[in-house]
Design a protein with these regions (language model features):
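Charged, amphipathic alpha-helical segments and their flanking helix caps
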Residues: 1-20, 26-29, 34-122
Length: 122
């Protein structure tokens, strides 16, 4: 796993919800975020998609609570995330920022989050 992936996962775990790189271990407990990290050249912006997974029979409301929390953390200008060991990334909202994921099960509700990540790691 690259430092950019480690830094994004660490930041999401500390500020939003447990986060795992895909494939997620089958014993992970809902709710959580999953991602398949994408990294581009130094200082280039890359699209990154996250999935927020929750359990509910009928509502996406819990998933949207986490999406709202993430949206507030990122703000309208993005958020700079720095770590002495892992480097620096800047996270921006993608477009669309959030959308329902149509699920095959009646008890899992998930939303897709689109981000733009600028990676300043070598």
């Amino acid at each position: 796993m690259t430092n950019g992936a480690k830094l994004l996962i660490k930041w999401l775990k500390e500020n939003v919800l447990n986060t795992y790189q895909e494939p997620v271990n089958s014993n992970a407990s809902l709710p959580y975020i999953s991602l398949s990290y994408v990294e581009n050249e130094f200082a280039s912006q890359t699209a990154q998609q996250l999935t927020i997974w929750t359990r509910s029979d009928s509502s996406y409301s819990e998933a949207y609570l986490y999406a709202d929390k993430l949206s507030k953390l990122i703000g309208e200008s993005g958020v700079l995330v720095k770590d002495n060991d892992l480097g620096t990334i800047v996270i921006y909202k993608g477009s669309p920022f959030c959308q329902n994921r149509l699920d095959d099960t009646t008890t899992i509700r998930a939303v897709l989050i689109n981000l733009l990540i600028t990676n300043y790691n070598n």
